[in-house]
């Protein structure tokens, strides 16, 4: 056994709707080996856990063996760190409460921790990204949903049940759009993918002006942002409304938390100035005046394909080491 490498590696796992990626990561955040498989290939949780555990074992055995790996950290949507579970995910085929930490721990013989993907992103940004050295910041992930995390006093805030920081499900419009969570008027219903597309359709309905959006068979935030670059007035108006609503929601959030920065991640952030300029204006118009001008808007500078894995590796270092053997 090489004593220089004992327990100086962890496994980071990123579970998304499309793919499950896993990697061996060292203490400096270097990804040493990586593999993946399509998440959708395993609609039954037992088969999924088998595929993931088998993949992790093969990766470990091909890269130094079990004696070098301390633990496993997992990033997943709808995950609850306190429960070690994915809870009532609206998008995965696995329904109810899935005790993923326990299922994998029993198969791998390693300590396993699972956390919400936004919480994991915050850990990664603090350790390796643009939040390094900060004690108080917010992470916002914009994509198919709106994920968020409060990082304050040097750590992720979980709340009593592990659901703290869910700004996506705060109300920005009384009796507004129905959200996937079942409530009405949630910020997510206006700023995530489906909400942006709905706003685009509303803009087109309200005006008879010509727009290339009318000729697009399948609208997406990326297509709309591309049309913004071409000067399409309705596309620009779509992101103006989206940004304005986002900025209002963030102003409420920041007025309570008093963060040093808000860090943005996710595919929708590629809209750039078309989203962020109206968001920043609305934020400045509504945030508590004592912190106006002090909260930085930052975009994550970590590699998008590695961000969640790196955050999951930080989570893995935090979990107590597990062994199948009882020490005397």
Language model feature labels by segment:
Residues 117, 143, 312:
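Active-site glycine-centered loops adjacent to acidic/histidine catalytic or metal-binding residues
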Residues 35-37, 90, 160:
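Short hydrophobic alpha-helix segments
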Residues 112-116:
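General beta-strand structural signal in soluble alpha/beta enzymes
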Residues 132-190:
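Glycine-rich phosphate-binding loop of actin/hexokinase-like ATP-binding domains
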Residues 85-96:
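A charged helix-plus-loop insertion that forms the helical arch/lid used to bind
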Residues 1-71, 81-83, 102, 106-110, ...:
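ATP-binding/phosphotransfer module of carbohydrate and carboxylate kinases, centering on a glycine-rich
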Residues 77-80, 143-145, 268:
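Short glycine-rich anion-binding loops that position phosphate/pyrophosphate groups of nucleotides
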Residues 32, 87, 157-158:
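Generic structural signal for well-ordered beta-strand positions
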């Amino acid at each position: 056994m090489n004593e220089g490498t004992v327990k100086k590696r962890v496994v980071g796992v990123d579970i998304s709707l499309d793919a499950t990626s896993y990697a061996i990561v060292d203490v400096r955040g270097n990804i040493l080996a990586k593999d993946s498989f399509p998440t959708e290939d395993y609609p039954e949780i037992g088969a999924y856990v088998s595929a993931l555990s088998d993949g992790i074992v093969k990766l470990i055995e091909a890269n130094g063996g079990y004696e070098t790996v301390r633990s496993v950290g997992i990033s997943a949507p709808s995950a609850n760190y306190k429960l070690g579970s994915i809870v009532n995910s609206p998008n995965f085929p696995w329904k109810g409460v899935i005790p993923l930490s326990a299922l994998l721990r029993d198969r791998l013989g390693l300590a396993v921790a699972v956390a919400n993907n936004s919480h994991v992103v915050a850990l990664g940004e603090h350790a390796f990204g643009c939040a390094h050295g900060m004690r108080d910041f917010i992470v916002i992930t914009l994509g198919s949903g709106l994920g968020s995390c409060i990082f304050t006093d040097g750590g992720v805030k979980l709340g009593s049940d592990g659901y703290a920081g869910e700004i996506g499900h705060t109300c920005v419009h009384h009796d507004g759009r129905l959200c996937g969570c079942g409530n009405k008027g949630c910020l997510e219903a206006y700023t995530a993918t489906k909400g942006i597309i709905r706003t685009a359709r509303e803009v087109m309905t309200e005006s008879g002006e010509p727009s290339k959006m009318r000729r697009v068979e399948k609208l997406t935030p990326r297509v709309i942002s591309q049309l913004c670059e071409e000067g399409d007035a309705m596309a620009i108006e779509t992101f103006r409304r989206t940004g304005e609503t986002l900025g209002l929601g963030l102003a409420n959030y920041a007025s309570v938390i008093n963060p040093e920065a808000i860090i943005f991640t996710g595919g929708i952030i590629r809209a750039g100035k078309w989203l962020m300029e109206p968001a920043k204006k609305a934020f400045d118009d509504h945030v508590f005046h004592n912190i106006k001008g002090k909260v930085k808007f930052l975009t994550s500078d970590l590699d998008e394909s590695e961000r969640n894995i790196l955050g999951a590796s930080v989570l893995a270092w935090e979990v107590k080491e597990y062994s199948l053997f009882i020490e005397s």
